[in-house]
Amino acid sequence: MDEILWIWQQKSNNIHDLHSHIWDSWADEEGSIGKAYGYQLGIKHQYKEGMMDQVDRVLFDLKNNPYSRRIMTNIYVHQDLHEMNLYPCAYSMTFNVTKEPGKEKLTLNAILNQRFYRAVRPADSILVSRFSL
């Protein structure tokens, strides 16, 4: 859970913010993993609704157009790969909201897209499945 918050809430690329040694081998002297993970989520872009980073955009879209199939993030940015100390394994997430007919409850669905390597941590294979709103 700490890694999720480090990337999605703090939008950080500095391992010192994580307080874990899992990422040490990819960090430089200052603790940075380069333009990877949280760094990419924190880059602000201009939208007609204003400046937002990817996380802010997901939250905006979930609030204003929750049934869209186009609510997603992507941190595998080709032009920045040479400045990442490691390429992202979990590189994209797609979100949508569903509602069962006749029920009030909404369900947030989140799909994690990930590249698999020989040694994948079991907790990474299915990070998020369904949350109730």
Language model: regions and residue ranges:
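Terminal, non-catalytic protein-protein interaction segments that mediate quaternary/complex assembly
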Residues: 1-133
